[in-house]
Regions:
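Charge-dense, helix-prone N-terminal extensions
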Residues: 1-115
Length: 115
């Protein structure tokens, strides 16, 4: 497998969030418990983030060159063209995606750290 774009940066930022671990299924997945929030799908060579729905809809309209819808059953994920994002933007979007799956106690831990 070739290394996904910005893998090192994404792995570092994702693993800095409370409770995150990495697994592998057709590419790296970043999860809290059994719930994924960011993954690289090798067959489509795409990063996919689980962003909040209201944020997704805004991004699909405002930044279509970077964000596109990806539906899995009833769940809407976002294809993310990570090369178009700065490290600060990646951190913000990964944190937003993480919040969609992280339990409240872990979210409190992050708030206590000032994020």
């Amino acid at each position: 497998m070739t290394r996904p774009p910005k893998y090192g940066t994404i792995a570092r930022l994702a693993k800095a969030l409370p409770g995150v671990h990495e697994t592998f299924y057709n590419g790296p997945w970043f999860k809290v418990g059994k719930k994924g929030f960011a993954l690289y799908w090798q067959s489509t060579e795409s990063w996919i983030f689980k962003l909040p729905q209201d944020q997704q809809m805004m991004l699909f309209d405002a930044r279509p060159e970077t964000f596109a819808p990806m539906r899995s059953g009833r769940i809407l994920w976002s294809y993310v063209e990570v090369e178009n994002l700065s490290t600060a933007e990646l951190r913000d979007f990964l944190t937003s995606a993480w919040r969609t799956v992280a339990p409240k106690n872990l979210q409190s831990d992050l708030r206590m750290k000032g994020n």
